[in-house]
Swiss-Prot record:
Name by which UniProt lists this protein: tRNA dimethylallyltransferase
Sequence similarity: Belongs to the IPP transferase family.
InterPro entries according to UniProt: Dimethylallyltransferase, IPT, P-loop_NTPase
Lineage, top ranks: Bacteria, Pseudomonadati, Thermodesulfobacteriota, Desulfobacteria, Desulfobacterales
Positions bound to ATP: G12, P13, T14, G15, V16, G17, K18, S19
Naturally occurring in which organism (per UniProt): Desulfatibacillum aliphaticivorans
Protein keywords: ATP-binding, Magnesium, Nucleotide-binding, Transferase, tRNA processing
EC number assigned by the record: 2.5.1.75
Interaction with substrate tRNA (site feature) positions: T103, R125
Keyword Nucleotide-binding: yes
Length: 306
């Protein structure tokens, strides 16, 4: 039986310091980085996604960043297909593959695949989107509460994209999307994986996420969002529902004052970090590391890649 191709994953919650660990390790071992971040795939969403700078990308090639425009459809299925193709190309070129990110569902999709019952119907999807435009996403969210309460609890009432997708799966399959995901055991991974997850004390992590928000605002997040809106990328788009972009849209459109928008942005960033930690704790194969344990990670990677 042929040996599996090897992948090193360095995951963790937002603000923990993943890139500062992954970049030097990938460079040292002759690797390239596949990003696993649900916001970084969108072009023009730069500050709020905290994308690596061009100098970092010059030092180590990064993939799955700036893949689609803000108004294009993108999900974990698309991510998995594209990321797996990149991983195969890198392996064929004798490059080491490093995966860096905090979007656990994308990482799981890359490593293990996704459930296949979530079929799609473009006509049904367009109909649901028109309904959302006419009645508002909250009306569809109420409908989702009846058909799939767990998904409704997980999805924000303003997130029209995810609401319509969950409804589409419910209608097409007759089963809640949440039940299908829970029942799916995922396929055996085609990769041999060394999986690290970085962690910090909760209070320190939350201090860092608050500082991260302040830094994004100082870098011009509001101006970036205004530019996106002026270019026709509306608040209803999936990309614009991301943390930071959603809050600045609400401020710019008058739904929130600036102080409240910033307060909610910090709160929601902390909540995201907490959810991400909960997600990664479900992986029994993870090696938990503090961000400053670079030498320990280096030793394990060296042994793994031999």
């Amino acid at each position: 039986m042929p040996s599996k191709e090897k992948i090193v994953v360095i995951a963790g919650p937002t603000g923990v310091g993943k890139s500062a660990s992954t970049l030097p390790l990938a460079r040292e071992f002759g690797g390239e980085i596949i990003s696993a971040d649900a916001v970084s795939v969108y072009r023009c969403l730069d500050i709020g996604a905290a994308k690596p700078g061009m100098e970092d990308r010059r030092l180590v090639p990064h993939h799955m960043i700036d893949v689609v425009d803000p108004d294009e459809d993108f999900d974990a299925n698309i991510y998995a297909a594209q990321a797996r193709a990149i991983a195969q190309s890198l392996h064929e070129s004798d490059k080491r593959v490093f995966v860096d990110g905090g979007t656990g569902f994308y990482i799981k999709a890359l490593l293990y695949g996704l459930f296949t019952e979530g079929r799609s119907d473009p006509e049904l999807r367009d109909s649901l989107r028109r309904e959302a435009a006419q009645l508002g996403s909250h009306a569809l969210h109420d409908r989702l509460k009846d058909l799939d309460p767990p998904s409704a609890k997980r999805i924000h009432p303003n997130d029209a994209y995810r609401i319509t997708r969950a409804l589409e799966i419910c209608i097409l399959t007759g089963k809640p999307a949440s039940a299908q995901q829970a029942a799916h055991g995922f396929e055996e991974s085609p990769y041999d994986v060394l999986f690290f997850c970085l962690h910090r004390e909760r209070e320190i992590l939350y201090q860092r996420t608050d500082q991260r928000v302040d830094q994004m605002l100082a870098m011009g997040l509001e101006q970036e969002v205004r530019g996106l809106l002026e270019n026709g990328y509306g608040p209803e788009l999936k990309s614009m529902q991301s943390i930071g972009y959603r809050h600045m849209c609400q401020y710019i459109t008058g739904a929130l004052n600036y102080e409240d928008a910033v307060t909610l942005m910090k709160r929601d960033t902390r909540r995201l970090a907490k959810r991400q930690m909960t997600w990664f704790k479900a992986y029994p194969e993870i090696r938990w590391m503090a961000p400053d344990e670079t030498e320990a990670m280096r030793r394990e990677i060296s042994l793994f890649l031999e």
